[in-house]
Amino acid sequence: MSDNCTVAPANGRITGTQISIVAVVVLGAFLALLNQTVMSPALPVIMSDFAIDASTAQWIMSIYPLVSGIMVPVSAFLIDKFSTRALFFGATLVFALGTLLCAAAPDFLFLIIGRVLQAAGSGVLMPLVSVVPMLVFPVEKRGTAMGMAGIVMSAGPAVGPVVGGAVIDTYGWRTMI
């Protein structure tokens, strides 16, 4: 990867374009990470709705990090084949399709398939959070960009159960997805 960034001004200052690009990627990653833990409070309600036991319902939580983890090394291959923009939009589309499938799931199998799609999109989004600042910021500003991304991304899994519980209590589990 080159040390030359593609959107930096000659004076080395951070531009609104750079901030916007990284903010969009970090927001996508935040939502993907939030989705990893937001389902925890919904498990009892989902168990009741689909008449499944706890060991079966646990797949809702387990499948996400499993598939997401598999997709991270796959994304290295994809980054070599496609632009970061195309990968971001593709991963976001896969994540959104999975989300829609989960929200409309008529049974547990469709819910799991939706979670697999969400996780596949998430697994491609996560590496982009590291790659995009390297492409967008000059060397001397990359640490700042990565630090900001890290702060936002660490909040996703932390607030997931709280947000999930509040949404479930107010609107139901399908809205939360």
How does the language model describe each region?
Residues 2-177:
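Transmembrane-helix bundle of Major Facilitator Superfamily
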